[in-house]
């Protein structure tokens, strides 16, 4: 147990630089916490990704734009990117980048929260409301931290890619 609530953990992680977060997550994952008994696992939350897709198209409709179509070819790329940002929270992709635009986020615990945050950021909003892109894919990768006392914490990693 790191001695903090989920909200405190999210706030702490959001305040870190990418290097600080990488060091912290590595220390947790490899057992250098005080109890040396942390298990880290992860999974893709496809329901959350679908909800982001739906909310994105709702924002587009609210702004008089046509809906994005889902790009199933790019979905595996978005999944890979969501897992990559666990270690390197940046727009630098190991395998290159074939999207027109990319939104990333970390820590938001719901689809509505992440879309709201993106809509309140000029660059992310521009991607969502682009008149160049016609397709998108979304991934939500969730890290689950299980501690010796049985308590758990979750950290959400979000990626939305755009193309035409």
Functional labels for PLM-detected ranges:
Residues 24-87:
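A short alpha-helix/helix-coil micro-patch that ends at or immediately precedes a cysteine
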Residues 74-115, 128-130:
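Short, surface-exposed glycine/acidic/tryptophan-bearing loops
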Residues 1-32, 36:
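N-terminal propeptides/leader regions of secreted preproproteins
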Residues 61-66, 99, 133-136, 156-157:
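Loop/turn elements at helix/coil->beta-strand transitions in domains of secreted/extracellular proteins
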Residues 111-164:
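Disulfide-stabilized extracellular recognition modules
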Residues 45, 51-54, 99-108, 114, ...:
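Secreted/periplasmic proteins
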